[in-house]
Regions:
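Conserved alpha-helical elements of sugar-nucleotide-dependent glycosyltransferases
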Residues: 18, 195, 253
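A short, amphipathic alpha-helix embedded in the catalytic core of nucleotide-handling enzymes
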Residues: 26, 109, 165, 195, ...
């Protein structure tokens, strides 16, 4: 943890789900000062309220696409955590914006981190790089040929850029392939997170959660605080030029998720099934998490029901506010 003690840090996307939870974890780990770069398109000021009260956190409202700003903020930093991205659905709707944010933005971060000789860069990748995997549990060496999303392609290229910067400049980096992150502060407009929110609304209203189809598609859920902790461990470790799955290593079907949520919310309703909709191409996710355990000392600690309980507690007072943002989703 000596690398963290008193460190000056930049967190991009630091007002978002994982970013803000990471800021909290970094303060706890004893870093000296944190600059957060966030354009607040997905990030929320509330997510940083606790951290900003520490007096050690400064929010800079801006974009990773702003090369000069990124360089200014990276100068003099010991550590950089790159979490900024746009969501997978928006990448499909606006691929040029996705290119500018996900690819050019990440290039700016890599260029600045290498140029200003930061000790280490920890950056977010995604299980999306695998597309519909062929091997389960899925290890990091699984190929990327099955991915057909722009988001996944951008994350693959980000990984490739990071490796090449390591080869060209000696940049120390670790990248983390997040699987299905859920929990307090989560982006409520994501593909599966939106489903969770609708279920919570229905259950609270005394109506059964609705699943389109059999609900047997699976995900590998990892709690927000666990994903944040993985970043802290990656920064503290001596590992470099490494890419790791960050997941629970447990497969959960949509049906099991709905049933767990019913239990957590104290409801005895049964899940209701509707007609199957067009299927998302990825019907199964299960990560091999042994590499992260071996090299980073990371293992997910928060069990699904415990995590869902925390999610419900966070969501309840924000219910109306969250529902109101659904129709006018920020483009």
């Amino acid at each position: 943890v000596s690398r963290l003690e008193g460190a000056t840090v930049l967190v991009t996307g630091g007002a978002g789900t994982i970013g803000s939870t990471l800021v909290d974890a970094l303060l706890e780990a004893g870093v000296g000062r944190i600059d957060v770069l966030d354009n607040l398109v997905r990030g929320r000021l509330d997510n940083l309220a606790g951290a900003q009260a520490s007096g050690r956190v400064e929010l800079v409202r801006g974009d990773v696409g702003d090369r000069d700003l990124v360089h200014d903020l990276t100068k003099g930093k010991d550590l950089v955590f790159h979490q900024a991205a746009i969501r997978i659905t928006q990448c499909a709707e606006e691929p040029r914006l996705a290119l500018e944010v996900m690819v050019d933005g990440t290039f700016n971060i890599l260029e600045a981190a290498a140029g200003h000789k930061v000790d280490k860069l920890v950056a977010a990748s995604s299980a999306s790089v695998y597309g519909m995997a062929e091997e389960f549990p899925t290890g990091e060496r699984h190929h990327h040929a099955n991915n057909d999303t722009f988001y996944g392609a951008a994350k693959s290229f980000n990984e490739g850029m990071a490796r090449s910067f390591h080869a060209m400049t000696g940049l120390d980096y670790v990248m983390l392939r997040y699987f299905n992150v859920y929990g307090p502060r989560m982006d409520v407009h994501g593909l599966y997170t939106e489903v969770l929110v609708r279920w919570m609304e229905r259950i609270l209203d005394g109506r059964p959660p609705l699943i389109f189809g059999d609900g047997l598609q699976t995900m590998d859920f990892v709690y927000t605080a666990d994903a944040a902790r993985a970043n802290v461990l990656a920064a503290a470790s001596d590992t470099t030029d490494g890419i790791y799955n960050i997941a629970s290593g447990t497969e959960t079907s949509l049906l099991e998720m709905a049933e767990a949520l019913l239990r957590v919310m104290g409801s005895d309703l049964a899940v209701e099934h509707g007609p199957a909709r067009q299927v998302n191409g990825v019907v199964r996710r299960l990560a091999d998490t042994s590499a992260a355990a071996r090299d980073l000392g990371f293992k997910a600690e928060v069990e699904l029901e415990e995590g869902l309980r925390e999610l419900v507690t966070w969501w309840k007072p924000l219910r109306d506010e969250i529902a109101a943002t659904r129709k006018v989703d920020a483009k």
